[in-house]
């Protein structure tokens, strides 16, 4: 069957949520859906039922359109394990290694990528490789350092279109665990109306200290109890501490790069990371994270189809 003029459905299906785009044959967005249908939220692993829901939300044009998926849906806990590529970052390599679903016609899952961290340890990513490939293809980038914030933030060094280093920080997950399930939890308001820039900066300053994250986490508690920190800004302080600790430890790698850092983010996350990077004197070029994922899925689909 030829899909040359067919619309395409691209899905970034992660641990806690998914994003789906209905794209025309040129890559323009006809419809978009997002929901809290991450693989960890689907107790019976009935991924086919969730996909049917998504297709219904995207409308009649989604019927019979080929589907390209990336992210944790391709993990051992997902629909089918798509494996990992070794260091490859290009559209062609990801498309060639994408696996079809036997129980769902015209559906492919993009593999993840494995590499080594700046410390020489094994590291992996799923979903971010598609955004990275989309940026590299659309902006003709063949080298540089990329930051892809998230639950697990990724820092990727590209040389000659290949991944030479991949370092993951559990920044977002640590923030949520500490906010919801730690001794800090009772000190934080149930609902903080947006991020407090003042509190976030306090967290960044705390992260720059000498004694490290394990001490600094308790310092948030002590600071609130003694009046050093405003409890209303507690979550923002914790956010600044988590992101600041991440950037402090990667700053040497960032400052050694010949070109500005590429920050792949959008919305509040883009603002927080731009603020934190500036605090640590690191220049960055902002790239729209949602657009990057969409472009990557579209380009991979065109290679497959």
Question: Residue ranges of each PLM-predicted region?
Answer:
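A short acidic Gly-Thr/Ser loop motif
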Residues: 11-17, 72, 148-152, 171, ...
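Glycine-rich phosphate-binding loop plus the immediately following alpha-helix
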Residues: 40-42, 114-149, 154-206
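Short beta-strand-loop/turn "lid" adjacent to the catalytic site in phosphate-handling enzymes
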Residues: 60-122, 160
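Short glycine-aspartate micro-motif
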Residues: 8-12, 66-68, 144-148, 262
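N-terminal phosphate-binding loop and adjacent alpha-helix
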Residues: 29-65, 74-77, 81, 184-188
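Short acidic-glycine loop/turn motifs at beta-strand connectors
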Residues: 24-28, 103, 157-162
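ATP-binding/phosphotransfer module of carbohydrate and carboxylate kinases, centering on a glycine-rich
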Residues: 18, 183-305
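Short glycine-rich, Thr/Ser-proximal phosphate-binding strand/loop in the N-terminal lobe
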Residues: 8-46, 287
């Amino acid at each position: 069957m030829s899909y040359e003029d067919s619309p395409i459905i691209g899905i970034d299906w992660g641990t806690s949520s998914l994003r789906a785009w209905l794209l025309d044959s040129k890559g323009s967005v006809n419809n978009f859906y997002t929901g809290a249908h991450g693989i960890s939220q689907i107790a019976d692993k009935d991924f086919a039922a969730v996909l049917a829901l998504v297709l219904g939300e995207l409308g009649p044009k989604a019927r019979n359109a080929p589907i390209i998926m990336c992210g944790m849906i391709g993990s051992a806990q997902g629909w089918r394990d798509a494996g990992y590529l070794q260091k490859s970052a290009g559209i062609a390599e990801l498309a060639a290694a994408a696996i079809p679903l036997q129980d769902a016609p015209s559906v492919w899952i993009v593999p993840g990528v494995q590499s080594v961290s700046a410390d020489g340890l094994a590291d992996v990513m799923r979903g971010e490789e598609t955004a990275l490939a989309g940026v590299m293809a659309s902006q003709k980038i063949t080298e540089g350092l990329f930051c892809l914030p998230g639950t697990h933030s990724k820092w990727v060094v590209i040389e000659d279109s290949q991944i030479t280093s991949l370092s993951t920080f559990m920044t977002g997950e640590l923030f949520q665990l500490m906010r919801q399930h730690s001794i800090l939890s009772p000190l934080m308001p149930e609902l903080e109306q947006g991020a407090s820039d003042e509190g976030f900066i306090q967290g960044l300053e705390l992260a720059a200290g000498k004694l490290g994250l394990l001490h600094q986490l308790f310092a948030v508690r002590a600071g609130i109890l003694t009046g050093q920190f405003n409890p209303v800004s507690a979550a923002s302080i914790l956010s600044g501490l988590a992101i600041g600790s991440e950037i402090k430890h990667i700053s040497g790698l960032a400052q050694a790069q010949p070109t500005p850092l590429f920050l792949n983010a959008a919305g509040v996350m883009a603002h927080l990371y731009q603020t934190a990077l500036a605090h640590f004197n690191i220049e960055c070029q902002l790239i729209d994270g949602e657009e990057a994922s969409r472009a990557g899925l579209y380009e991979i689909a065109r290679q497959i189809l």
